[in-house]
């Protein structure tokens, strides 16, 4: 007869799984067994069908369990019945064709506009090379929404100061042109003036490391982390947070989702749509201004 203990012994002796992993499987399978026995006193593992498992998942969701928890427990049940099928305890696998609930992606973290205003205030920064370079990096991320790898790959020739455009080489070497404003233009010119005084100034690389060549991802991440900590309490303080901040600001000030997709260099619109949650503040303001009972 099929039992949880036989499966757990298989995990220990044949798959060499850790005791903690074995206990996690035991806990998940016991939860299903308890549910099934409440439905039928004559419950056996061999009598389980797909509908019973599907109803169990719905029961867990109704009880407030997260999709990640439901999917983990379903995964345990799937492995249990794969074992049972191979060992001929059952003739068919009732969990095989079942899919768990979709897991929601974590919402992007971003800085508020007043936090960015404070961070970019020129009085917050020194006038030496490292400070000017750091501020330029922050503004580049915030005004263009580019990725870390794209920023590191920039050359001086990628910047068109007359048209105020920057050529960005993204994933798959796909290039896109992104406009920028006077604040970034002035920051870049100030940075390039100081850069020209350095030994490696003839390099075509836009953002020079201290010893020449391109900056490393670690260097840029540290610069961003250190400076975001000055104005915000977000748990994550990374270049990608500034990319999220760019996207949020664009949407809140009226940019269309298709235009934002092109600026961010996304291949699919669905990737960009994760940012639409950030316009809630704008929708709330519209509601307050327009609804007669607001």
Residue positions per predicted region:
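Conserved catalytic core of the tyrosine transesterase superfamily
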Residues: 1-294
